[in-house]
Amino acid sequence: MSGIRAHILGWFGLVALACADELPAIIDCHVHLWDIARPAGLGWIKKDDKTLNRSFLPADHESIARTHGVSGTIVVQAGQSLPDNQWNLDITAHNPRLYRGIVGNFSETIGTPAFQPLFEKLCENPRYLGYRLSGRYQEKLTDAFFADLRLTAQKGRAVDFLTGGYRLEDITEIARRVPELRILINHLGGVKLDGKPLAAAWVEQFRALAKQPNVHCKVSALFGRWEKQPAPQDIAAYTEVLDLASESFGEDRLIFGSDWPVTEQTADYAAVLRLTRAYFDRKGPAISVKLFHQNAAAFYRPPVPK
């Protein structure tokens, strides 16, 4: 086998499908780990939340990964603390085959003098794949903000956007102004489901964003899209938004993420996979391989596991 061919197979880690109903080896692109006792804490977790108000560490996640055929994981930082960028790298360093990379968080620092030195230091580790931006954006869309995004692209890193703080139209403008930057919107663009047809204005903004070729969409936190919990587990409740995402982004720009352990508030990991497969399996095994594996590797570009 040539060196180039070996590299490609190693990078994508493709697993042949023995039969039509088998999953490809999964790269789950949205898993959170946290130590609830760390000084910065996680302000979005309520004290009385019996599901999430505890630590979720690699040992908790690894058993789930083994059970469900997850060959790779992208860990997304759960909070906005700067030290947690390094903490996530450190806590997953023991198992680089599973923990392919880290998406940190620079929500409070991007566009300030503190961004560049810390970001460049983190980029010395090839498993640092980029960062997520969340929170309020209005005061941040400055020349310095865009300069930091261009530096991010120059370093070959990507940016996840948690919508809500950043509106879809803002991300569209960012994608236009920094076309070399790889952008991934989380959780189907932050759509909120209530059993009614999707709002026409939101659909228009979503489609406009999808026209930017450097923007990808994460099919993640499906159960969390519902305003009222527990969320329905019938695929019919999600077909409209999944049809929209598939038509808008196409088969090469959709990426799977579970949002574990936040999903535990509604359903277990098996239910997340079952729901996602219920929709995408009918599109054929080639599409499933892209959604669950190839697109993640192509977007995040994690180092080849050894």
Question: For the regions a protein language model found, what residue spans apply to each?
Answer:
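Mid-to-C-terminal alpha-helical segments outside catalytic/metal-binding sites
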Residues: 4, 19-29, 52-72, 243-244, ...
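Mid-domain alpha/beta scaffold segments of enzyme catalytic cores
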Residues: 21-155, 161, 209, 236, ...
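Active-site metal-binding loops of divalent metal-dependent hydrolases
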Residues: 31, 78, 188, 258-260
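Alpha-helical elements of Rossmann-like donor-binding domains used by nucleotide-donor carbohydrate transfer enzymes
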Residues: 60, 87-90, 117, 121, ...
